[in-house]
Amino acid sequence: MTSNLAIARGALDNIPPVALACSRWLIVFLIFFPFVYQTIQKKRKDFKNEFWKLFFLSATGYAGCGALPYVSGLTTTVTNMSIIYALSPIFIVLLSAYIYKERLKYLQYCAVLLSLFGVSFIIFKGNLNNFLNLNFSIGDVWIFGAAICWSLFSIFLINWKSKFNIIERFTLMSLLGSLILIPFFLIEHFLFL
């Protein structure tokens, strides 16, 4: 993901953020589709049965987590993006506990706090002044949204079983992610550029 955050800041001078995310997933779909076409054809009924789960996973993990870091990169720093996105594992633990009504054990709370401290220590290089001098922007809200999307995607990807193997599922979610992003691409293209 770190390289993705750097791309979010670097490539945006040439390619708008939603266009970048949409084309990225469309290219992935086009590369993988020839290899899974026949098996997906045979599993059309499974696709129909799993459509909303695949749609949710595509919306969170592919569209949301694919586009929001790029949108964020327009108005925030890679450092801020890294700090906020590094909170994803903590969000996964907390959201999973909330969604599945599980009580966190004492050691899990300790692990969350320890990882939060560790991430903060590394990013701020152990210097409190680095933390105090942070400036936040709207881009930080977008990357926070991406971290939440990634967390939800991770939780449900593990817990939702599928009739599709990993490559078939990846290909279908790449297509759905692209399709979800197309309206936002059109808005970006015609209203903002």
What are the roles of these predicted feature ranges?
Residues 1-22, 132-159, 179-184:
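Glycine-/small-residue-enriched transmembrane alpha-helix faces in small-molecule transporters
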Residues 1-5, 33-85, 121:
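Specific transmembrane alpha-helical segments of multi-pass solute transporters/efflux pumps
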Residues 3-15, 27, 66-76, 84, ...:
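Juxtamembrane C-cap of transmembrane helices in multi-pass membrane transport proteins
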Residues 11, 20, 24, 72, ...:
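Hydrophobic/aromatic residues within transmembrane alpha-helices
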Residues 31-40, 88-113, 117:
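C-terminal transmembrane-helix exit sites in multi-pass transporters
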Residues 32, 104-126, 147, 175, ...:
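Hydrophobic transmembrane alpha-helices of multi-pass small-molecule transport proteins
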Residues 45-52, 82-85, 101-121, 136-137:
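Loop-to-transmembrane alpha-helix entry segments
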Residues 54-58, 70, 82, 112, ...:
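Residue-level signature of transmembrane alpha-helical cores of multipass secondary-active transporters
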